[in-house]
Amino acid sequence: MPPSGRFDRTIALAGTGHLKIGNFVIKETIGKGAFGAVKRGTHIQTGYDVAIKILNRGRMKGLGTVNKTRNEIDNLQKLTHPHITRLFRVISTPSDIFLVMELVSGGELFSYITRKGALPIRESRRYFQQIISGVSYCHNHMIVHRDLKPENLLLDANKNIKIADFGLSNYMTDGDLLSTACGSPNYAAPELISNKLYVGPEVDLWSCGVILYAMLCGTLPFDDQNVPTLFAKIKSGRYTVPYSMEKQAADLISTMLQVDPVKRADVKRIVNHSWFRIDLPYYLFPECENESSIVDIDVVQSVAEKFDVKEEDVTGALLAEDHHHFLCIAYRLEVNHKRNADESSQKAMEDFWEIGKTMKMGSTSLPVGATTKTNVGRKILEGLKKEQKKLTWNLGIRACLDPVETMKHVFLSLKSVDMEWKVLSMYHIIVRSKPTPINPDPVKVSLQLFALDKKENNKGYLLDFKGLTEDEEAVPPSRCRSRAASVSVTLAKSKSDLNGNSSKVPMSPLSPMSPISPSVNIPKVRVDDADASLKSSLNSSIYMADIENSMESLDEVSTQSSEPEAPIRSQTMEFFATCHIIMQALLAE
C-alpha cells in the first residue's frame, strides 16, 4: 500500500491488485515521460480505456516546468477537436497530478515516417489536412502550439492524426506579441530562433510546412548537426526540392516556408490551395464549429442507464458545462469511443460536427453522416426499413454549394467545353453546343437548379438535366440573357478574384433560405416569379451581376467553328451526348 495521504483519492481494488483513482482503474504502464509514468486506465462505469498521465509535483518543481504543465492543462481543457488529444479529467493529489486523456494507440508520426520513409502522396495529404484542421481550430481559440513536430503528432488505431503535447503552447491576446524562443530547432520558424517578436500562428504554419516536407520526402528541409549552421539554413529559407516532388506540393510548401512571416501563407491560403483541396473532407473545415450545443441522445440514454440516473440529470450536467462532473466525463468518453471505434472513422468524425453533407458536384447518393447526430448510419437504415414508402428519388447532380457558387461553377464548366447558353432566370439556363455547318441547329438542354425538399431530410440542391418544353422554347430573346465565348473576360475576372479556385469552391451546406427555384415537390412555377424572387435574395457583391451585364443575344452569336464533326444519328442520342459532355465538365477536377 502507498504511504497514507499520498493518493488521497486512491484505493486498492479488492482481488485485482490495481489502484483506483476517481472512477478510473489504473493498470499497466504504457509509456514514460519526464515527470512520471503514463498508465493505461479504464473507466469503471463505461469500461472504456484511457491514458492516465501521472505528473509528479516534486519533479516538475525541480525542473521548473510547473508553468509548462499548467499551460498544457489549461489549453487542452479548451479544445475539443477530432484531431487533438482529448483531456477528460484532471485529478490532483498532494504529490501528483493525474491527467485522464484519450488513449491514442498508433504511436508517433515520427516513428511511422522513420519506419516507412517517404509517405505516399495521398496519405501525406490526408495527414496534412487533419493537422491543418487541428491547428486552425487551436488558432481560432487563440491558442498557438509552438512545438509542432512529428514527435508530437500521434496516430490512432484508424491512422488519424491527434495533435498532442501542448506544454509549450500559449494563449494569444489581441494586440500582444510573443517573444519566447521555444520548440524544436529543425521545425522552428526563423523569427522564433532569432528572438524576434511574433504573433503566434505564423510559427505553427512554418512548422506545418516542415512536417509536410518530411512526410513527402522522408527527410527534413533544414538539418545539420551543428546548431549555428542549422539556424543559418533556417534563416536563409533555402532548401532542396526533390525532383520527384509534385509541383503543386512544392508550391504549397514554398508558400509556408517563407522567411518573412508577413509573406507566409496563412490557414485560408493553405486551405484554398489546389493541392490541399484534393479529397478534402468537409468535416475538417465546417461552417459551424460550435459543437457544444449538439447532444447525442443515444449517448445520454446510455450514460443514464449505466449510472442509474435520469436522462435529465445527464443533460443538466452537460448544460451546466461542468467538465469535471462525472456524468460529463462519462458522456465525453462514450462520444469519443463511438467516433474512434467506427470502422469508417471518417464518417464518424463528420458526425462530431453540426454539418449537412460531405458532398461534391456529382455525388448521387446520400452519405452516412448527413445529419447533426451521431450514429447516423444505423438510424438511416432503421428509418428506411420502417418507412419504405417515404423514400424519395432524385435524378441529377446534387451539390451543397451556395446556389450562386454552384451556378458560377456551371458557367465556368460550360465555358471550358465551349458551350453556349441562354439565361431564362438566375438558376435556369438553356445550353447547346456551338453550331457547325454539319449541325447548324444543335440540340438544346435545359439546366435548372432545384432546392431539395427539406421535409424529406434532403439538404442542398439538384442540378436537373432535361429536354426543352414548349414554354421554354417560346421565351422571346428580349426576355433572355444569352452569352458566348466573348464574355470570357467576365468569367476570368470572377475566377481570379477567387484565387483561381472558382471551379473548386468547397461544397458547404447553406443556412435556411427561400427555395431558389421550384421545389422538387412543386414543379410548376412562372419564370417571372422565380426570377424576381431570386434576384431579391442575391448579394450585390456576387459576380452574377457581371455575367448578366455581359450577356448578348444568342441570335447574334458567331457560328464560327473548328473542324466539322460527324453527324449524330438522332436528337435523342445527341441530347444524351450533350448531357454527357456537360457532366464531364462539371465533375472535372
Swiss-Prot record:
GO biological process, one term: protein localization to lipid droplet
EC class (word): transferase
Protein EC: 2.7.11.1
List of residues binding ATP: I30, G31, K32, G33, A34, F35, G36, A37, V38, K53
Sample GO molecular function, one term: protein serine kinase activity
Reaction(s) catalysed by this chain's protein: L-seryl-[protein] + ATP = O-phospho-L-seryl-[protein] + ADP + H(+); L-threonyl-[protein] + ATP = O-phospho-L-threonyl-[protein] + ADP + H(+)
Keyword Nucleotide-binding carried by entry: yes
CDD domains found in the cross-reference section: AMPKA_C, UBA_AID_AMPKalpha
Taxonomic superkingdom: Eukaryota
GO annotation, cellular component aspect: cytoplasm; nucleotide-activated protein kinase complex; nucleus
Domain Protein kinase: 24-276
Disruption phenotype: Reduced survival as a result of hyperosmotic stress induced by NaCl. Double knockout with aak-2 results in reduced glycogen accumulation.
Catalytic residues in the record: D147
Keyword list, A-Z: ATP-binding, Kinase, Nucleotide-binding, Serine/threonine-protein kinase, Transferase
Record-linked InterPro entries: KA1/Ssp2_C, Kinase-like_dom_sf, PRKAA1/2_AID, Prot_kinase_dom, Protein_kinase_ATP_BS, Ser/Thr_kinase_AS
Biological role: Probably does not act as a sensor that couples lifespan to information about energy levels and insulin-like signals. Together with aak-2, involved in the establishment of germline stem cell (GSC) quiescence during dauer development. Plays a role in the maintenance of glycogen stores which are necessary for resistance to hyperosmotic stress.
Protein family (similarity comment): Belongs to the protein kinase superfamily. CAMK Ser/Thr protein kinase family. SNF1 subfamily.
PANTHER family: MAP/MICROTUBULE AFFINITY-REGULATING KINASE, NON-SPECIFIC SERINE_THREONINE PROTEIN KINASE
The protein's name: 5'-AMP-activated protein kinase catalytic subunit alpha-1
The gene coding this protein: aak-1
